[in-house]
Curated annotation (Swiss-Prot):
Gene, per the UniProt record: SPC19
InterPro entries in the record: DASH_Spc19 (IPR013251)
Keyword presence, Repressor: no
Keyword NAD attached: no
Protein name in UniProt: DASH complex subunit SPC19
Organism for this UniProt entry: Yarrowia lipolytica (strain CLIB 122 / E 150)
Main location class: nucleus
Length: 166
């Protein structure tokens, strides 16, 4: 910090010496009253910089730290509250998940598993001749109904498209 401050001071002193040299050169070149007036205005606009001591810099830093510290503490407190609420939500969700898992384990077979019977070749079901005939009869009836539905859909399309202007 001290090194940077020393560099800044050296740079400022260098700038001041350059401005002085330039103003001296301009004064020596000024041959007309108009030029003298212009140079006078330029020199009046030159800003002067003062050195700032290290104790002043430290005092300013301490003032800023004292001003900012309560705000930072408030922000940290708010973040801690939010984190604790998120932790409690996480615990609640974990316990709810465990409860749901235990409920699922109590019912090993879902409704679908009970209804769906795998249709493997290994699962051969013995049926009587009557049941087989009834099944074939139901399949024929099903095919007839499919055909009837197709015919009705076709008639419906014909009636809709037949009414369209050509």
């Amino acid at each position: 910090m001290t090194n940077t401050l020393d560099d800044s001071i050296g740079s400022m002193q260098n700038c001041v010496s350059i401005v002085r040299d330039t103003s001296l050169k301009l004064r020596s070149r000024a041959q007309t009253p108009e030029e003298t007036e212009r140079i006078k205005k330029v020199l009046q606009l030159t800003r002067k910089y003062e050195e700032v001591t290290q104790s002043e810099v430290l005092a300013a830093q301490q003032r800023q730290a004292a001003e900012i510290a309560p705000q930072v503490q408030d922000l940290i407190g708010g973040v801690e509250k939010q984190i604790s609420s998120l932790h409690s939500k996480e615990r609640k969700l974990k316990s709810q998940s465990e409860l749901n898992k235990s409920r699922l384990e109590q019912f090993p077979m879902t409704r679908r598993e009970v209804v769906d019977v795998p249709r493997d070749a290994d699962n051969v079901v013995e049926v009587t001749e009557e049941e087989l005939q009834e099944l074939e009869e139901l399949q024929r009836e099903r095919e007839k109904l499919k055909m009837e539905i197709s015919r009705l859909n076709l008639e419906k399309r014909k009636s809709v498209y037949g009414k369209l202007p050509q």
